[in-house]
From Swiss-Prot:
Native organism: Pseudomonas paraeruginosa (strain DSM 24068 / PA7) (Pseudomonas aeruginosa (strain PA7))
Substrates-to-products reaction catalysed: N-succinyl-(2S,6S)-2,6-diaminopimelate + H2O = (2S,6S)-2,6-diaminopimelate + succinate
InterPro entries in UniProt: ArgE/DapE_CS, Bact_exopeptidase_dim_dom, DapE_proteobac, Peptidase_M20, Peptidase_M20_dimer, Peptidase_M20A
Recorded family membership: Belongs to the peptidase M20A family. DapE subfamily.
Involved pathway(s): Amino-acid biosynthesis; L-lysine biosynthesis via DAP pathway; LL-2,6-diaminopimelate from (S)-tetrahydrodipicolinate (succinylase route): step 3/3
Name under which the protein is recorded: Succinyl-diaminopimelate desuccinylase
Quaternary structure and interacting proteins, as annotated: Homodimer.
Binding, Zn(2+) 1: 73, 107, 170
Length: 383
């Protein structure tokens, strides 16, 4: 079954149209143009925002009152080896098992289609709805994420735009659609550490300073450190060394320098400044000649039980019969940028079992359920 099949539902028809556009990050491949045409027909005011090489748009419908925003990305990761796919990655096929196959099916063109169709139905049923509905869409989520949601949020905040609630369409579900929603994410703090020694001949170690030997006890202490206990919403902060590099490639040369890359995934129990000071204190304790460059990817955020989480949970229960489980596990998402506006943020999307993999796929019927969950959430908040 393909995108041209007359038996496809509106959600699946749109999902297939989006998947068939090869929008490998940061290319949008006119996915946003397709979405904007649909939203304009539903009464939305459109504001394209091309920033550097990245396509973004902001769309809004409604007046004063609370604003519910749907956020997501049209870009996808590269396919990997095309010959390893059972079907061409941008053909958007529904197979014999009822799976919608294609790059972006789960992450996250299926969610985008469900959002659009749910909103179209809602504004048709409730043309005089309360508050406003908005869309914040980017083509720079899978890449550096410098000129996408982060940049749009900065512009919206600068002009005082209101954003009360936001549903991000990231694939949050693990086994069944709606079984897990993300109501927060840990912060991500990375660093490049350089330890300086003195290069020399291995036969004359007294004339050199081996940075590997010098750094090893400090790195071991950092790896063993207990950073915090976490809390009811977040696991304890984790520290991981991801890269170590030193040496000339020769067995008879003591290197002059060691570089290490490491990352914190940190909870709301720790701060950026606190983690940095503790790392630097350990390095000083070991008497190292060190330099560190820090890179903050995002602060932790948390949406506690309230209007948005309650509405989403009630909608999932009504549509699927199951209780959802809020979670803050996993990596970062664009929700971290939106949360800086004081917005309640929840990530809700399809099952994430095959995201970024060869043969990415999602159960087609799950997108119908997701559309209904989005629709019922709109009803609970804005009808």
């Amino acid at each position: 079954m393909t995108a041209s099949s007359p038996s496809l539902s509106p959600t699946l028809e749109l999902a297939c149209e989006l998947i068939r556009r090869p929008s490998v990050t940061p290319v949008d491949a006119d996915c946003q143009a397709l979405m904007m045409r649909r939203l304009e027909a539903a009464g939305f005011a459109l504001e394209p925002m091309r920033i550097e090489e990245v396509d973004n748009f902001w769309a809004r419908r409604g007046g004063d009152g609370p604003v519910l925003c749907f956020a997501g990305h049209t870009d996808v990761v590269p396919t990997g080896p095309v010959q390893a796919w059972q079907h061409q990655p941008f053909d958007a096929l529904i197979d014999e098992q009822g799976m919608l196959c294609g790059r972006g099916a789960a992450d996250m063109k299926g969610s985008l289609a469900s959002m659009i169709v749910a909103v179209e139905r809602f504004v048709a049923d409730h043309p005089g709805h309360k508050g406003a509905i908005a869309f914040l869409i980017t083509s720079d989520e899978e890449g550096p994420a410098h000129h996408g949601t982060k940049a749009v949020v900065e512009r919206l905040a600068a002009r005082g735009e209101r954003l009360d609630w936001c549903i991000v369409g990231e694939p949050s579900s693990t086994s069944l659609v709606g079984d897990v929603v993300k109501n927060g994410r840990r912060g991500s703090l990375g660093a490049r550490l350089t330890i300086r020694g003195v290069q020399g001949h291995v036969a004359y170690p007294h004339l050199a300073k081996n940075p590997i030997h010098l750094a090893a006890p400090a790195l071991a202490e950092l790896a063993a450190e207990h950073w915090d206990d976490g809390n009811a919403f977040f696991p304890p902060t984790s520290f991981q060394i991801s890269n170590l590099n030193s040496g000339t490639g020769a067995t008879n040369v003591i290197p002059g320098e060691l570089s290490a890359l490491f990352n914190f995934r940190f909870s709301t129990e720790s701060t950026v400044e606190g983690l940095q000071k503790r790392v630097e204190a350990i390095l000083d304790k070991h008497g190292l000649d060190w330099h560190v460059e820090w890179a903050l990817s995002g602060l932790p955020f948390l949406t506690e039980p309230g209007e948005l989480l309650d509405a989403v949970a009630a909608s999932i229960k009504a549509v699927t019969g199951r209780e959802t489980r809020p979670s803050t596990s996993g990596g970062t998402s664009d929700g971290r940028f939106i949360a800086t506006m004081g917005t309640q943020v929840v990530e809700l999307g399809p099952v994430n079992a095959t995201i970024h993999q060869v043969n990415e796929r999602v159960l087609a019927s799950d997108l119908e359920l997701l559309t209904e969950i989005y629709y019922q959430t709109l009803v609970r908040l804005l009808a």
